[in-house]
Structures are given as structure tokens and as C-alpha cells.
Amino acid sequence: MEKNNLKKILQEKMEKAIKVLGNELKGLRTGRASVNFLDSVTVEAYGSKVPLAQVASLSTPDARTINVQVWDKSMVSSVEKGITIANLGLTHATDGQLIRLPIPSLTEERRKEFVKLAHKYGEETKISLRNIRRDGIEELKKLEKDNIIVKDEYHSLSEQVQKLTDEYSSKVDSAIKQKEHEIMTV
């Protein structure tokens, strides 16, 4: 690996780790209704499993309700089944092609569980970042051993890798702090 590409490659890997964290945090329920909450729902449609968003329009008319407007009337029962199978802890009311999902308020205990889960996701992401950093440092050691870079360059590039890791680690902290605030706000 070339020393010039190393930082860029590490940055891309760290960016992916942050994206994964973002997707995991989207799945955590806050007290508010959000269509992102249904991202994990898949529906049996025309012989294959597809995301819910491909067979229905999703909207939040208020802070406590998600509406699922199914486009094809024959798909309503499949959508209901998909929502049930996703095990989101939601009940639904069907009115023709419209499925309403009332979002119950979270108890204090449940909010704390979600905060713990958010912190767990954050810690897993930080572990990924540290592993990416370790791989980068090992690559630098290999470049130094092969006399592609000198010791001063190795130390300089190692510091850059550490700064990059610190930068992404602080992004994880702020994402977790923001999600914790969302969850704990009643």
C-alpha cells in the first residue's frame, strides 16, 4: 500500500464505521414517531422480500403516529404480516389501504435500556475505529521495514492516523450524546 493512499483508505473505513453506527442508532426508538423506525421491515411482495418503503408510502402525521399507505390493496395483509414479524412492539389499525401505527410513550426504564444500547453501539464502533487504526499503524510499520518510509515519516504518519482516529471517536461520542438526548426527552 502506498503511504499517500493510506490516510484516505483509513478515512473511508472510519467513515463506513460511522455510517453503520448511524444506521444502528436510527433503529433505536425515541419518544417520537419516525419512518426510520420501519427501515427493518421487509414485506413478501410478488414472490420476494422487499423493504416496506417499496410497497407503501410512509408518513408521520403527528409525533405519536406512523401512517403506512399501501399502494396495492392486495399487499395490505403482507404489509401487516411484515410489521408483525419485525417485532417492533407496535400494534396497528388498518383502514382500507392505510395502516396506522400508534407509537406508545416509552417508560423511563425502557428509555434507559435504549440509552444503554446506544452506548453499546458506540463502544462497538470505537472498537472498529481502533482496529482500523491498528491496521493502519501495522501498514506503516511494514512500509518502514521495507525502507519505503523513514522513521521520522513513520512517526509523523502515525500521529496523523491517531488524530484521524481521535476525530472519528469524537464523532461517535457526539452521535451517542445526541441520541441519548433524543431518547431521554419526553
UniProtKB/Swiss-Prot annotation:
<dbReference type="Pfam" id="PF01765">
    <property type="entry name" value="RRF"/>
</dbReference>
<dbReference type="InterPro" id="IPR023584">
    <property type="entry name" value="Ribosome_recyc_fac_dom"/>
</dbReference>
<dbReference type="InterPro" id="IPR002661">
    <property type="entry name" value="Ribosome_recyc_fac"/>
</dbReference>
<comment type="similarity">
    <text>Belongs to the RRF family.</text>
</comment>
<keyword id="KW-0648">Protein biosynthesis</keyword>
<comment type="function">
    <text>Responsible for the release of ribosomes from messenger RNA at the termination of protein biosynthesis. May increase the efficiency of translation by recycling ribosomes from one round of translation to another.</text>
</comment>
<protein>
    <recommendedName>
        <fullName>Ribosome-recycling factor</fullName>
    </recommendedName>
</protein>
<dbReference type="GO" id="GO:0002184">
    <property type="term" value="P:cytoplasmic translational termination"/>
</dbReference>
<dbReference type="GO" id="GO:0043023">
    <property type="term" value="F:ribosomal large subunit binding"/>
</dbReference>
<dbReference type="GO" id="GO:0005829">
    <property type="term" value="C:cytosol"/>
</dbReference>
<dbReference type="InterPro" id="IPR036191">
    <property type="entry name" value="RRF_sf"/>
</dbReference>
<keyword id="KW-0963">Cytoplasm</keyword>
